[in-house]
Amino acid sequence: MVNLNQSLGDLFKGIIPNVYVLGATIVSFLILFLFITYFVYRPLKKYIKKRKDFLQSHIDLTIKSNVEAEKLEKKSQQKLLETKEFCTDLKEKSQIEANKFLEDAKKTAIDNARQLINEGQKVLLEYENEIKSKYYMNVINVAVEICQKYLEKQDKNNKILQQSLIADLEKELKKRENSSKKKDNFGK
């Protein structure tokens, strides 16, 4: 049993450390812990916090920008719809105005054409009447000249016959003038 006690004592002797070594280990651990805490952990924690804040601010800014972009897109879509409606209304109004203008222009052109036709017909009637009166005057003048020549020839032969022919001729001229006046009045 002695052996057993001694071997157990040797076994436990190696397990229980020396107090000085244990104290030095604890002190070195504390120094290392403090060193790591102040020089590694805290700066790393600050850097991670700054980085996290930086990323979070960018995420928030991105979300805010997306919301603003959606609002602007909605506004743009609304303005686009309003512009399309305005263009459609403007197109319809311009077509109505153009059709109205065309109708007015057609009406004016038709009225002007009718007026020109009426004036042209009046001018033609006046010209026709003028030509007729000139024609009748030429016929009368030619007839008078023929009669005068005939009468001059007959004057030598028979003065009485000449006077009766002149009287008849004057009557005939008056009838023709009256009939031409009647025709002129009838033609008008």
Curated annotation (Swiss-Prot):
Transmembrane segments: 19-39
Quaternary data: F-type ATPases have 2 components, F(1) - the catalytic core - and F(0) - the membrane proton channel. F(1) has five subunits: alpha(3), beta(3), gamma(1), delta(1), epsilon(1). F(0) has three main subunits: a(1), b(2) and c(10-14). The alpha and beta chains form an alternating ring which encloses part of the gamma chain. F(1) is attached to F(0) by a central stalk formed by the gamma and epsilon chains, while a peripheral stalk is formed by the delta and b chains.
GO molecular function, one term: proton-transporting ATP synthase activity, rotational mechanism
Topology of this chain in the membrane: Single-pass membrane protein
Chief subcellular location: membrane
CC per GO annotation: plasma membrane; proton-transporting ATP synthase complex
Family matches, as Pfam families: ATP-synt_B
Family affiliation: Belongs to the ATPase B chain family.
Keywords (A to Z) from UniProt: ATP synthesis, Cell membrane, CF(0), Hydrogen ion transport, Ion transport, Membrane, Transmembrane, Transmembrane helix, Transport
Protein name per the record: ATP synthase subunit b
Its job: F(1)F(0) ATP synthase produces ATP from ADP in the presence of a proton or sodium gradient. F-type ATPases consist of two structural domains, F(1) containing the extramembraneous catalytic core and F(0) containing the membrane proton channel, linked together by a central stalk and a peripheral stalk. During catalysis, ATP synthesis in the catalytic domain of F(1) is coupled via a rotary mechanism of the central stalk subunits to proton translocation. Component of the F(0) channel, it forms part of the peripheral stalk, linking F(1) to F(0).
Keyword Transmembrane in annotation: yes
InterPro entries with a match to the protein in the record: ATP_synth_b/b'su_bac/chlpt, ATP_synthase_B_chain
Organism from which the protein derives: Mesomycoplasma hyopneumoniae (strain 232) (Mycoplasma hyopneumoniae)
Cellular location(s): Cell membrane
